[in-house]
Amino acid sequence: MKYIVTALLLLVGCPVSAQDLRLPFNGRWFVMQGGDTPNVNQHMTVEAQAFGVDFAKVGGASQRQLALGTPTKVEDFFSWGEPVLAPADGTVVSVVNDRPDNPLGTKDAEHPAGNCLVIRVAEERFVYLAHMQRGSVSVKAGDTVKRSQRLGLCGNSGNCDFPHIHLHVQDTPDLNAGRGQNPIFGAINVELTGKQFTGVTWPLIRGLFVSNP
């Protein structure tokens, strides 16, 4: 862990660039999957999703719980129904909005992304957002979106254990042909091993608590 901490600390104070993303939500969320090795990020085993990140909202008295009590349904999770926001300016390339949300304990492996959208944010740079609520996506292919714009709601569609937001960046709009790129998030707040960092520009690894300023 100390090597990961050292690597991240080297990025503190890095200037924000046009390529940096905004976290796609409001509030405090936990990084469930993230990093550049399979032991901290299962997405590293899928070329298009390499460096992908999974976020779950936390709450409760400790601000570390994924749900209140023992969840029995998707609505018990803090992530459920939270707005999903555009991480950058761009153009919507594709949208899926009609997949059902899975009851807790079931998955849709046939449609792993569930309700999702792809945004072109730069040349050969496409942001993929997945697992949204059925019917909640408020944009369509061809729409121009602005950073922080509401796109839909966090759901439990696709190959999803419980409600969360999946984000990854790839070099083509085709999930089956793309190669993943490391998403860098600019000027965010991070809690790492109990320490607070404000306004940093970092890649994300599993185990961080993150929020926008």
Model-identified regions with their sequence ranges:
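A structural signal for short beta-strand/turn segments enriched in small hydrophobics and glycine
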Residues: 90-92, 142-154
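Generic structural motif
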Residues: 29, 82-92
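Positively charged n-region of N-terminal signal peptides that target proteins for export
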Residues: 1-4
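Non-catalytic extracellular/periplasmic "stalk"
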Residues: 18-62, 67-71, 75-77
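N-terminal signal peptide c-region/cleavage motif recognized by signal peptidases
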Residues: 13-15
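Acidic, glycine-rich catalytic/binding loops that coordinate metals and/or anionic ligands
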Residues: 20-34, 40-42, 65, 111, ...
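Short histidine-centered loop motifs in beta-beta connectors
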Residues: 125-148
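Zn2+-dependent peptidoglycan hydrolase active-site motif and core
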Residues: 69-71, 77-79, 91-133
